[in-house]
A protein has these predicted regions:
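Basic, flexible Lys/Arg- and Gly-enriched helix-loop patches that mediate nucleic-acid binding at interfaces
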Residues: 1-233
Length: 233
């Protein structure tokens, strides 16, 4: 890869800005100042700007703790979106949420610009689980447990894949639900089959990766390569 292209992708700048940095001697390759944008980099080369090492990222993967009232979209004319919460941190990346949470729901949203990865975690063929803590307005029953395990048939006739539901609170109104498919308003509609309403829904994990407990609502951070791998493991 050319050095100027590498700079544009890793330092989040334009080719023109990269050219200026090079001309001013701010860029080092393997510890030596380099001013030539057409320099071809090898995989083993290290690049720094003003002495700070850069890390090449073909794609970006972010964990965001979605607060209530924010919509799971890239853009929206009326409401704040999950991408809005990232601000201008990645001006040259076209981030989008891999999957959605309802406006009133909270928890783990994965933001990325990797369309192939997003497809993999959303496709029912890959069986990537999503784990939720759900508050319902009536205690969990054995009928619900049995129905979820067998696969609920929704009111419109849609037959769902088996899901897991377990009680978390003594009164049976706080439960954990694990899904391996995604249907519009799925959890609310599943409980609705049994006459139960959903008061709150919080996504705790995607695949084998749990939401970072240190992230307050609205906060986000990058995922490491190891964390990304946990999602589909």
């Amino acid at each position: 890869m050319r050095l100027d292209k590498y700079l544009a992708e890793t330092a989040q700048c334009t080719r023109g800005e990269a050219k200026t940095m090079l001309a001013k001697g701010r860029v080092q390759v393997n510890g030596a100042v380099c001013k030539k944008g057409d320099t071809q980099l090898k995989e083993t080369d290290t690049v720094a700007v003003d002495g700070a090492p850069l890390r090449y990222q073909k794609f970006v993967y972010l964990m965001l703790n979605k607060p209530e009232g924010v919509v799971s979209a890239s853009t929206d004319k009326r409401d704040t979106t999950v991408v809005d919460l990232v601000g201008d941190a990645y001006p040259r990346r076209e981030l989008f949420p891999a999957g959605r949470l309802d406006k009133t729901s909270t928890g783990f949203v994965l933001l990325t610009d990797d369309g192939g990865f997003a497809h993999d975690i959303l496709s029912p063929r890959h069986h990537v689980s999503k784990t939720y803590t759900v508050t319902i307005d009536t205690p969990l029953t054995q009928e619900m447990r049995t129905g979820f395990a067998a696969g609920v048939t929704l009111a419109d006739g849609t037959a769902l894949s088996p899901a897991e539901v377990t009680a978390l609170s003594p009164d049976g109104c706080t439960v954990r639900v694990v899904l391996r498919q995604g249907v519009y308003h799925q959890i609310k509609r599943m409980f609705g089959v049994y006459g139960a309403g959903v008061n709150a829904l919080h996504r705790e994990a995607i695949g084998g990766l749990a939401l970072d407990a240190q992230l307050a609502p609205g906060q986000w951070r990058e995922l490491s390569d190891e964390e990304v791998a946990k999602i589909t493991r």
